[in-house]
Amino acid sequence: MAAFPKSTRALMIGLTGVMVMVIAAWAASSASAACKNRGNLDVRYCDENGDLVADTPKDSSKWLNPSTLIFSYTPVEDPSVYENVFAEFMTYLAKKTGKRVKWYGAESYAAQVEAMRSGRLHIAGISTGPTVFGVNLAGYVPFSIMGKGGKIFGYKLQLITHKSTNIRKVSDLKGRKIAHVTPTSNSGNQAPKAYFKEMGVVPGKDYKIIFSGKHDNSIMGVANKDYDA
Protein backbone atom coordinates (compact mmCIF):
# COMPACT_ATOMS: atom_id res chain seq x y z
CA MET A 1 0.00 0.00 0.00
CA ALA A 2 1.25 3.45 -0.87
CA ALA A 3 2.40 5.80 1.87
CA PHE A 4 0.55 9.10 1.77
CA PRO A 5 1.67 12.50 3.11
CA LYS A 6 0.10 13.39 6.46
CA SER A 7 -1.78 16.23 4.77
CA THR A 8 -3.92 13.79 2.76
CA ARG A 9 -7.00 11.71 3.53
CA ALA A 10 -7.71 8.39 1.79
CA LEU A 11 -11.03 6.78 0.88
CA MET A 12 -10.79 3.09 -0.03
CA ILE A 13 -12.80 1.67 -2.91
CA GLY A 14 -12.75 -2.06 -3.67
CA LEU A 15 -11.13 -2.89 -6.99
CA THR A 16 -10.31 -6.19 -8.61
CA GLY A 17 -6.92 -5.73 -10.17
CA VAL A 18 -3.85 -7.86 -10.72
CA MET A 19 -0.43 -7.65 -12.29
CA VAL A 20 -0.33 -9.57 -15.56
CA MET A 21 2.68 -11.37 -17.01
CA VAL A 22 2.78 -11.25 -20.80
CA ILE A 23 5.01 -12.65 -23.49
CA ALA A 24 5.72 -11.89 -27.14
CA ALA A 25 7.15 -15.03 -28.70
CA TRP A 26 6.88 -14.05 -32.35
CA ALA A 27 7.22 -11.14 -34.70
CA ALA A 28 4.16 -9.43 -36.09
CA SER A 29 2.73 -11.16 -39.12
CA SER A 30 2.03 -9.08 -42.19
CA ALA A 31 -1.48 -7.76 -42.68
CA SER A 32 -3.28 -10.26 -44.87
CA ALA A 33 -6.68 -10.45 -46.46
CA ALA A 34 -6.50 -14.19 -45.74
CA CYS A 35 -7.02 -13.54 -42.01
CA LYS A 36 -10.51 -14.80 -41.25
CA ASN A 37 -10.84 -12.99 -37.92
CA ARG A 38 -8.92 -10.11 -36.41
CA GLY A 39 -11.38 -8.71 -33.87
CA ASN A 40 -9.96 -5.58 -32.24
CA LEU A 41 -6.34 -6.51 -32.95
CA ASP A 42 -4.03 -4.33 -35.02
CA VAL A 43 -3.89 -5.21 -38.73
CA ARG A 44 -0.50 -6.85 -38.26
CA TYR A 45 -2.09 -9.60 -36.12
CA CYS A 46 -4.70 -12.29 -36.65
CA ASP A 47 -7.03 -14.12 -34.24
CA GLU A 48 -8.53 -16.99 -36.18
CA ASN A 49 -9.08 -19.13 -33.09
CA GLY A 50 -11.12 -16.37 -31.43
CA ASP A 51 -9.24 -16.31 -28.11
CA LEU A 52 -8.88 -12.48 -28.28
CA VAL A 53 -5.08 -12.52 -28.52
CA ALA A 54 -2.74 -12.65 -31.52
CA ASP A 55 -2.20 -16.05 -33.11
CA THR A 56 1.28 -17.44 -33.67
CA PRO A 57 2.16 -16.70 -37.33
CA LYS A 58 1.63 -19.71 -39.58
CA ASP A 59 4.93 -18.89 -41.25
CA SER A 60 7.59 -20.08 -38.79
CA SER A 61 10.13 -17.70 -40.33
CA LYS A 62 8.26 -14.89 -38.57
CA TRP A 63 8.76 -16.43 -35.11
CA LEU A 64 11.19 -14.67 -32.80
CA ASN A 65 14.11 -16.58 -31.30
CA PRO A 66 16.35 -13.93 -29.71
CA SER A 67 19.63 -14.95 -28.11
CA THR A 68 18.87 -12.47 -25.32
CA LEU A 69 15.43 -12.09 -23.75
CA ILE A 70 14.45 -8.61 -22.61
CA PHE A 71 12.31 -8.45 -19.46
CA SER A 72 10.46 -5.44 -18.09
CA TYR A 73 8.17 -4.65 -15.17
CA THR A 74 5.35 -2.13 -15.19
CA PRO A 75 6.59 1.48 -14.90
CA VAL A 76 7.00 2.55 -11.28
CA GLU A 77 8.46 5.57 -9.48
CA ASP A 78 12.04 4.28 -9.86
CA PRO A 79 12.39 1.47 -12.45
CA SER A 80 15.99 0.74 -11.41
CA VAL A 81 14.82 -0.42 -7.97
CA TYR A 82 12.82 -3.26 -9.49
CA GLU A 83 15.77 -4.55 -11.48
CA ASN A 84 17.16 -5.89 -8.20
CA VAL A 85 13.73 -7.13 -7.09
CA PHE A 86 13.45 -9.30 -10.22
CA ALA A 87 17.10 -10.40 -10.33
CA GLU A 88 16.26 -13.86 -8.97
CA PHE A 89 13.39 -14.27 -11.43
CA MET A 90 15.59 -13.26 -14.38
CA THR A 91 18.24 -15.76 -13.27
CA TYR A 92 15.56 -18.46 -13.11
CA LEU A 93 14.25 -17.47 -16.54
CA ALA A 94 17.74 -17.64 -18.01
CA LYS A 95 18.28 -21.10 -16.54
CA LYS A 96 14.98 -22.42 -17.89
CA THR A 97 15.33 -20.95 -21.38
CA GLY A 98 19.08 -21.25 -21.84
CA LYS A 99 19.17 -17.62 -22.93
CA ARG A 100 20.62 -14.46 -21.51
CA VAL A 101 18.03 -12.21 -19.85
CA LYS A 102 18.39 -8.44 -19.64
CA TRP A 103 16.36 -5.82 -17.79
CA TYR A 104 14.53 -2.98 -19.53
CA GLY A 105 13.36 -0.16 -17.25
CA ALA A 106 10.26 1.22 -18.97
CA GLU A 107 9.49 4.85 -18.15
CA SER A 108 5.83 4.72 -19.16
CA TYR A 109 3.02 2.33 -20.12
CA ALA A 110 3.21 3.58 -23.72
CA ALA A 111 6.96 2.92 -23.87
CA GLN A 112 6.45 -0.63 -22.64
CA VAL A 113 3.73 -1.31 -25.23
CA GLU A 114 5.80 0.20 -28.05
CA ALA A 115 8.90 -1.78 -27.03
CA MET A 116 7.01 -5.06 -27.34
CA ARG A 117 5.29 -3.95 -30.55
CA SER A 118 8.68 -3.25 -32.13
CA GLY A 119 10.18 -6.54 -30.94
CA ARG A 120 12.58 -4.94 -28.45
CA LEU A 121 10.76 -6.41 -25.42
CA HIS A 122 9.87 -10.08 -25.06
CA ILE A 123 8.51 -10.75 -21.56
CA ALA A 124 6.96 -8.26 -19.16
CA GLY A 125 4.96 -7.79 -16.01
CA ILE A 126 2.37 -5.12 -16.82
CA SER A 127 -0.44 -3.33 -15.03
CA THR A 128 -4.07 -4.19 -15.67
CA GLY A 129 -4.88 -0.90 -17.40
CA PRO A 130 -2.47 -1.16 -20.35
CA THR A 131 -3.16 -4.87 -20.88
CA VAL A 132 -5.94 -4.37 -23.43
CA PHE A 133 -3.84 -1.84 -25.36
CA GLY A 134 -0.87 -4.20 -25.33
CA VAL A 135 -2.95 -7.13 -26.54
CA ASN A 136 -4.58 -5.17 -29.36
CA LEU A 137 -1.63 -3.04 -30.46
CA ALA A 138 1.49 -5.03 -29.60
CA GLY A 139 0.52 -8.70 -29.63
CA TYR A 140 0.71 -9.19 -25.85
CA VAL A 141 -0.25 -12.72 -24.79
CA PRO A 142 -1.15 -12.70 -21.04
CA PHE A 143 -0.30 -16.04 -19.44
CA SER A 144 -0.05 -15.58 -15.66
CA ILE A 145 -0.84 -13.28 -12.75
CA MET A 146 0.80 -12.69 -9.40
CA GLY A 147 -0.23 -15.00 -6.61
CA LYS A 148 0.93 -17.20 -3.77
CA GLY A 149 -0.47 -20.37 -2.27
CA GLY A 150 -3.28 -20.46 -4.80
CA LYS A 151 -4.38 -16.91 -3.99
CA ILE A 152 -4.35 -14.03 -6.47
CA PHE A 153 -2.84 -10.69 -5.50
CA GLY A 154 -5.05 -7.67 -6.03
CA TYR A 155 -5.22 -4.05 -4.95
CA LYS A 156 -7.64 -1.25 -4.14
CA LEU A 157 -8.47 2.03 -5.79
CA GLN A 158 -7.67 4.84 -3.38
CA LEU A 159 -9.32 8.25 -3.57
CA ILE A 160 -7.28 10.76 -1.59
CA THR A 161 -7.97 14.39 -0.70
CA HIS A 162 -6.16 17.12 1.21
CA LYS A 163 -7.25 17.09 4.84
CA SER A 164 -8.21 20.75 4.57
CA THR A 165 -10.96 20.02 2.02
CA ASN A 166 -14.55 19.08 2.83
CA ILE A 167 -14.50 16.09 0.49
CA ARG A 168 -15.81 13.11 2.44
CA LYS A 169 -17.52 11.02 -0.25
CA VAL A 170 -17.45 10.53 -4.01
CA SER A 171 -20.39 12.89 -4.62
CA ASP A 172 -18.30 15.71 -3.10
CA LEU A 173 -16.03 15.56 -6.16
CA LYS A 174 -18.57 17.41 -8.32
CA GLY A 175 -17.25 20.70 -9.62
CA ARG A 176 -13.71 19.93 -8.45
CA LYS A 177 -10.33 19.57 -10.15
CA ILE A 178 -9.33 15.89 -9.87
CA ALA A 179 -6.07 14.16 -10.79
CA HIS A 180 -6.23 10.97 -12.82
CA VAL A 181 -2.96 9.22 -13.68
CA THR A 182 -2.92 8.36 -17.40
CA PRO A 183 -5.64 7.34 -19.89
CA THR A 184 -4.41 3.73 -19.80
CA SER A 185 -4.17 3.43 -16.00
CA ASN A 186 -6.72 1.08 -14.46
CA SER A 187 -6.89 2.31 -10.85
CA GLY A 188 -5.85 5.79 -11.97
CA ASN A 189 -8.45 6.33 -14.71
CA GLN A 190 -10.46 3.45 -16.14
CA ALA A 191 -11.74 2.06 -12.83
CA PRO A 192 -12.80 5.41 -11.33
CA LYS A 193 -14.61 6.24 -14.56
CA ALA A 194 -16.63 3.05 -14.14
CA TYR A 195 -17.09 3.05 -10.35
CA PHE A 196 -17.77 6.76 -9.91
CA LYS A 197 -20.43 6.70 -12.62
CA GLU A 198 -22.24 3.99 -10.64
CA MET A 199 -22.03 6.33 -7.64
CA GLY A 200 -23.65 9.20 -9.51
CA VAL A 201 -20.51 11.09 -10.53
CA VAL A 202 -19.34 11.12 -14.16
CA PRO A 203 -15.62 11.95 -14.45
CA GLY A 204 -14.94 14.54 -17.11
CA LYS A 205 -18.51 15.82 -16.87
CA ASP A 206 -19.15 16.34 -13.16
CA TYR A 207 -15.53 17.23 -12.44
CA LYS A 208 -12.45 18.28 -14.42
CA ILE A 209 -9.90 15.53 -15.11
CA ILE A 210 -6.21 16.43 -15.09
CA PHE A 211 -3.73 13.68 -15.96
CA SER A 212 -0.75 13.80 -13.61
CA GLY A 213 1.35 11.17 -15.43
CA LYS A 214 2.16 9.01 -12.39
CA HIS A 215 0.50 7.85 -9.17
CA ASP A 216 3.11 9.58 -7.04
CA ASN A 217 2.55 12.80 -9.01
CA SER A 218 -1.14 12.62 -8.09
CA ILE A 219 -0.34 12.05 -4.41
CA MET A 220 2.12 14.93 -4.20
CA GLY A 221 -0.20 17.15 -6.23
CA VAL A 222 -2.99 16.61 -3.69
CA ALA A 223 -0.58 17.21 -0.81
CA ASN A 224 0.49 20.50 -2.43
CA LYS A 225 -3.14 21.45 -3.21
CA ASP A 226 -2.59 21.38 -6.98
CA TYR A 227 -5.60 19.03 -7.20
CA ASP A 228 -8.67 18.75 -4.99
CA ALA A 229 -8.37 14.94 -4.99
Located regions from the model:
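Ligand-binding "clamshell"
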Residues: 134-146, 203
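Glycine/small-residue-rich loop that forms an oxyanion/phosphate-binding "nest" at active or ligand-binding sites
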Residues: 143-150, 157
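Hydrophobic core
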Residues: 19-24
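Structural recognition of the beta-strand scaffold that forms the well-ordered cores
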Residues: 102-105, 123-125, 142-144, 160, ...
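Bilobed "Venus flytrap"/periplasmic-binding protein-like clamshell domains
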Residues: 71-94, 129, 152-228
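Short helices/loops that flank or line small-molecule/ion binding pockets
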Residues: 110-124, 137, 171, 215-229
